[in-house]
Amino acid sequence: SAGELYQVTYTAPLTGSLRQGSAAALFAALQRAQPGGYAAHMAAGPEPVLSVSPELFFDWHDASGGGRILARPMKGTAARGATPADDAAQAAHLRASPKERAENVMIVDLLRNDLSRIAQPHSVRVPALFHTEGLPTVWQMTSDVQARTRPGTTLGDVFAALFPCGSVTGAPKVRAMQMIRALEAAPRGVYCGAIGVVRPAGVAGPDGLCSVAATFNVPIRTVVLRAGADGATTATCGIGSGITSGATADA
């Protein structure tokens, strides 16, 4: 209400206990419940990470003459319907919702600005806007933002320009992150960060063989397991939502 933010994504952790089974079994169960997307099981280290995120942070294929990068921010949600007709109506309502479209386009504009830091001049474009993706329990609104990266761009440059993804911060990005730090009780950890794969030179890309290729998700719908001194395993999953001046407590 003070006019400092258009939108902020506020999150909080949910915790529970893993009473039986293994991290691998839990990950398999999560994948059955949320198939597809950009899942990852990070088993190295004392705290396994189980991510069934549907959200692409970026997909980048670099080559000597410059690369191609795609970001697909996810902003806008509606529940799946109980019947085919209701389901179609829910998707149509999401596509037409002024509030959801406004939230989505704010983040699209933010990503366009972030990508411009590493993009060749006049190469940033939005080939898909307000697309609805059907997931098992919800409809999600996504948009595609693409650019050609400048020759010599490194993966470090990509992260410096884009991280963290604007869909989990808000806009303006820096002020939203400052507000998140002030309001949220603890750091988010891997939740809302980035998990991905970097592939070596020689991978096929849109313009031939790549010098590097990288795909990273935004780890929403992600569980972190921590073993306690008593042998019990605590499971933590972050949840959150974008808040605007038009948001209500019921939503």
Regions from the PLM with identified roles:
Residues 1-251:
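Extended alpha-helical targeting/anchoring segments
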